[in-house]
C-alpha cells in the first residue's frame, strides 16, 4: 500500500481556481464513494477549506492512484486537466505525512499558527470515518495529525495571539478605512457594518469588529436562529440587528462595509444587483472571505465599490508572519517526532503477515497435539477437564509468543526488524506470502 496526497492551496492556486475545487460538507459522502470506486484507491479522506482542497489516500499503486484522483478533481471542477495540473501538488508517503502534520499545526496556513485548521482536520477525520473512507492506515495517520496539532498548540506559543482569516479581514477593513477617509485612529465607530452568514467565521468577525470599535452591526442569515444567537452572545450594550438574507439588497443600501461568509456555492452579490440599489454617490466596501466566493468578480467594474477576497488578506498577514517564524521552527521539531512515530508504526506493518503466519502455524500445532492427547485419554475425560486443558495450552502458546511479538513490533531500527522477520521465517519455515495468496 502507498500513501499520497493530491491537492491545491493558497500557495498554488488563486481563489478563482480554489472555489471550483471546493467540496462542501454535504457533498463529501458522494465524493468519498466515487473516489473509493476507483480500482487503485483503498482509503480516502478529504480536507476542504477556504484556502485548500486536499485528498489524502491509500493506494494499491501510486501512479495510477494519483491519476485517478487527478481525473476526479478535473471532473468535479469542470477544469480540463491541462488547466488544472499547474495548480496541483502531489506528495508521497513521508512527504505526505509531514505535510498533513504541518497543516494540522497551522504551519501551512495563510495565517501562520491559526487554530481553525485543526478543527477542520478533525472534521475531515470524522467524515472520513462516518462515510467509510478511512481504514486502518488513514485512521492512524489522522489520529497522529490531530495529536501533532494539539502538541504544537500546547507545547509552543505559536497559537498565542495568532490572527485568523476573520481578524485579518477586519484589519484589512480598518486599513482601507484609514486610507480612504484619511483617519489616523483606525476606529471603526460610525461605519455601518453588514455581515452575511452566521457561522464560525462570522462569529469571529463580530468579536474583532467590536474590538475595533464598530458600533453599528447587522447580521443576515438564511435562518434567524443562529443570527439571533450570535447577536445575543456578543451584543452586550451594542444592539446588533439581525435579519434574513432575503432582505439583503435593502440592507446593502444602509451599509458602508459588507463582510460575506455564507456557504452559498454561487455568488449572491454581483454588479447587476448592486447597480439596481446603490446610489451613484454611495461608497461600499465588500470583503468576501467565503470560498466559493459570495461576491462576483464583476463588482470591481463599479467605481464606487471596493471589493476584496481572501487572497487580498496577504498584505495584512505578512506583518504577522515574521514574528512567528521562530515559533514555527520549534513546532517543526515536534512534528518530526510525530512523523517518526507514524513511520515506525507504518514500517511495523511489514511484520504483521509474519506474526499472523507464526500464530496460525503454532495454533494448528496446538490443536493437532491437543486432539491427539484427548483421544488417548478417552471418553472418561470429561468436558470440564477438556476445557481446563484447552485453556492451559492456549495460555502456554500466548505466553511463549508474547515477548517475541512485542519486541518485533516495537523494534524501531528498520534493518534490525527486517533481519528479525527473516530469522523468524527461516527458523519456523514460514511463508507469509504463500498464506496470503491462499
UniProtKB/Swiss-Prot annotation:
- Alphabetically, which GO biological process terms does the record hold? chlorophyll biosynthetic process; protoporphyrinogen IX biosynthetic process
Catalytic reaction(s) noted? (S)-4-amino-5-oxopentanoate + tRNA(Glu) + NADP(+) = L-glutamyl-tRNA(Glu) + NADPH + H(+)
- The EC category is oxidoreductase
Active-site residues are 50
Q: Where is this site: Important for activity?
A: 99
Source species, domain of life: Bacteria
The record's CDD domains line, in alphabetical order, gives: NAD_bind_Glutamyl_tRNA_reduct
Describe which pathway this protein belongs to, using the record's wording. Porphyrin-containing compound metabolism; protoporphyrin-IX biosynthesis; 5-aminolevulinate from L-glutamyl-tRNA(Glu): step 1/2; Porphyrin-containing compound metabolism; chlorophyll biosynthesis
Q: Which InterPro entries match?
A: 4pyrrol_synth_GluRdtase, 4pyrrol_synth_GluRdtase_dimer, 4pyrrol_synth_GluRdtase_N, GluRdtase_CS, GluRdtase_dimer_dom_sf, GluRdtase_N_sf, NAD(P)-bd_dom_sf, Shikm_DH/Glu-tRNA_Rdtase
The record ties this protein, via SUPFAM superfamilies, to: Glutamyl tRNA-reductase catalytic, N-terminal domain (SSF69742), Glutamyl tRNA-reductase dimerization domain (SSF69075), NAD(P)-binding Rossmann-fold domains (SSF51735)
- Is 4Fe-4S among this UniProt entry's keywords? no
Record-linked Gene3D superfamilies: Glutamyl-tRNA reductase, N-terminal domain (3.30.460.30), NAD(P)-binding Rossmann-like Domain (3.40.50.720)
Which of this chain's residues are annotated to bind NADP(+)? 197-202
**Cross-referenced Pfam families:** GlutR_dimer (PF00745), GlutR_N (PF05201), Shikimate_DH (PF01488)
Q: Name one GO molecular function term.
A: glutamyl-tRNA reductase activity
Write out the entry's keywords from A to Z: Chlorophyll biosynthesis, NADP, Oxidoreductase, Porphyrin biosynthesis
Primary role: Catalyzes the NADPH-dependent reduction of glutamyl-tRNA(Glu) to glutamate 1-semialdehyde (GSA).
What further note is attached to this protein's record? Answer: During catalysis, the active site Cys acts as a nucleophile attacking the alpha-carbonyl group of tRNA-bound glutamate with the formation of a thioester intermediate between enzyme and glutamate, and the concomitant release of tRNA(Glu). The thioester intermediate is finally reduced by direct hydride transfer from NADPH, to form the product GSA.
Q: How does it assemble?
A: Homodimer.
Family membership: Belongs to the glutamyl-tRNA reductase family.
Fill in the domain comment: Possesses an unusual extended V-shaped dimeric structure with each monomer consisting of three distinct domains arranged along a curved 'spinal' alpha-helix. The N-terminal catalytic domain specifically recognizes the glutamate moiety of the substrate. The second domain is the NADPH-binding domain, and the third C-terminal domain is responsible for dimerization.
PANTHER family registered for this protein in UniProt: GLUTAMYL-TRNA REDUCTASE 1, CHLOROPLASTIC
What is the protein name stated in its UniProt record? Answer: Glutamyl-tRNA reductase
User: What's the gene?
Assistant: hemA
